[in-house]
């Protein structure tokens, strides 16, 4: 028994609509998890929060959001691989950022100033909250 010609468009519509809902929901979950982790990190009183990092948000104006998130990931990896503090949170944050960007993250290193880890995380939290409100 074959599908009727009237049923095929309905099934295609259901497939498209449900896949859109699933992908949108993943965006919400990932962003919420990133924001939760950033809230935990930024309220901690830890000497690692004063570590110097590259000011990745001082990149040129034509830098895309993905490139910025890649730069943040690079800085997070540099911190949690060379210091033993906050590894669990910084590693999880790095993984979640990578899931928003892509598997390959090739970014040209730009000459930037320095900032602290706390400042980087605070600015990232602001960006993620804005992104979450639009998701």
Swiss-Prot record:
Glycosylated position list: 62
Signal peptide annotation: 1-24
GO cellular component: extracellular space
Sorted UniProt keywords: B-cell activation, Cytokine, Disulfide bond, Glycoprotein, Growth factor, Secreted, Signal
Cysteine disulfide links: 27-135, 48-85, 70-105
Residue ranges the record marks as coiled coil: none
SUPFAM superfamilies given in the database record: 4-helical cytokines
A Pfam family per the record: IL4
Calcium listed as a keyword: no
GO MF: cytokine activity; growth factor activity; interleukin-4 receptor binding
Entry similarity comment: Belongs to the IL-4/IL-13 family.
Protein task: Participates in at least several B-cell activation processes as well as of other cell types. It is a costimulator of DNA-synthesis. It induces the expression of class II MHC molecules on resting B-cells. It enhances both secretion and cell surface expression of IgE and IgG1. It also regulates the expression of the low affinity Fc receptor for IgE (CD23) on both lymphocytes and monocytes. Positively regulates IL31RA expression in macrophages. Stimulates autophagy in dendritic cells by interfering with mTORC1 signaling and through the induction of RUFY4.
Protein name per its UniProtKB record: Interleukin-4
Organism per entry: Bubalus bubalis (Domestic water buffalo)
Gene label: IL4
């Amino acid at each position: 028994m074959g599908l009727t010609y009237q049923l095929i468009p309905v099934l295609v519509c259901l497939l498209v609509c449900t896949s859109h809902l699933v992908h949108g929901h993943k965006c919400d979950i990932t962003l919420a998890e990133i924001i939760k982790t950033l809230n935990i990190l930024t309220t901690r009183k830890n000497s690692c929060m004063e570590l110097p990092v590259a000011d990745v948000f001082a990149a040129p104006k034509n830098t895309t959001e993905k490139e910025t998130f890649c730069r943040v990931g690079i800085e997070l990896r540099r911190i949690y691989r060379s210091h033993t503090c906050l590894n669990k949170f910084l590693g999880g944050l790095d993984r979640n950022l990578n899931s928003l960007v892509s598997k390959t993250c090739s970014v040209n290193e730009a000459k930037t100033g320095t900032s602290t880890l706390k400042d980087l995380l605070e600015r990232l939290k602001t960006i993620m909250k804005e992104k979450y409100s639009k998701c």
